[in-house]
Curated annotation (Swiss-Prot):
Zn(2+) 2 binds at D139, E174, H377. It holds the Pfam family M20_dimer. The gene is pepT. NCBIfam families: peptidase-T (TIGR01882), PRK05469.1 (NF003976), PRK13381.1 (NF009920). GO terms for cellular component: cytosol. This is Peptidase T.
Amino acid sequence: MTVLDRFLKYVTFDTQSNEETGTTPSTPGQRVFAEALVKELEAIGMEEISLDENSYVMATLPANTDEKIPTIGFIAHLDTSPDMSGKNVQPRIVTYLGGDIVLDAEENVVLSQSMFPELSDYKGQDIIVTNGKTLLGADDKGGVAAIVASMQYLKDHPEIKHGKIRIAFTPDEEIGQGADHFDVEKFGCDWGYTIDGGQIGELEYENFNAAGAKIIFKGLNVHPGYAKDKMQNASLRAIEFASWLPAEQRPEHTTGYEGFFHLTGMTGSVEEATLSYIIRDHDRKLFEEKKELLRTLVDKMNEAHPGCAHLELRDQYYNMREVVEPQKHIVDLAFEAMTSVGVEPIVKPIRGGTDGARLSFMGLPCPNIFAGGLNFHGRYEFLPVRSLEKSMETVIKIIELSARKS
């Protein structure tokens, strides 16, 4: 089975995560997918295969040489984003010759070159697209496919000498819980790589520092006809609070290393209103300043309206750079591997996070490598077939180079 065959099979599993369930995995489809992967790993001859109660899959490709070689891990996640349906995904492969791609003629859903100019980079290539009704799931079933296919390749090519290789598939990465129950000691690696990046060539060892915030506003409701000097409208307090945050620090106005406040949700009535934010910044100092600004503004609101606002603030993950940079050789190894298979590395900060960010702080330095997809989390997601194949080749080459250098 080719890496493409595996990917097309994997996207048929509905594994959309859900942060509201409070379970691990957060949705039953992830367990179904995990169990199917266990059977595939058994079929290709992997060893030490485990599936725990939280649906973490781990397996081993034993060393085929007596040389002392570091144990490397490769990790991808089972779930797809809760932002868009992952049910009944119907991928199709088109040879892209330029222009727009009609995904759903009936609903006029078009993958437009003017809106997504990166399409032009793949002219002449086969690309996998959606039917315009769901996401594709390249994030991160592209990574899962690349890892499983690379293990199959190494089993079929014993002439490629390698050390012990560990692989893992995790649930609920998309809702920030992918590392919650990851057993780093059991995984037993010197370092790892998540195969969870985007376009071909992406190599990332910097990510956002991240926090989540919820501000709850209390009001007082009375009959609006008799509300003068009595009513306190919680929804209006929430709107006022949102206006105090710097508009230039919203996601739509930031890029590169610029952080942001992102209003992800709001609910409201006169009696109670809630604003949900995520706070992001690559720089730890600026990250802390953003959190402090929220605290200051909540205090300001409560000074004007005593007891009106309550802040719930929780750190989610931190920038892995401070852990990975002292072991830069693991980034250099991936860089060399990409170059060796004809891929130009694109080293840039992740404007997001991966399981590897938290795992790095849990004792497993873990940069991120491309899986090949673009426009994640929506109906315009697509995956060039060559990019998927090169992701697999990069995994194999990392393993091969690690053995040679040892």
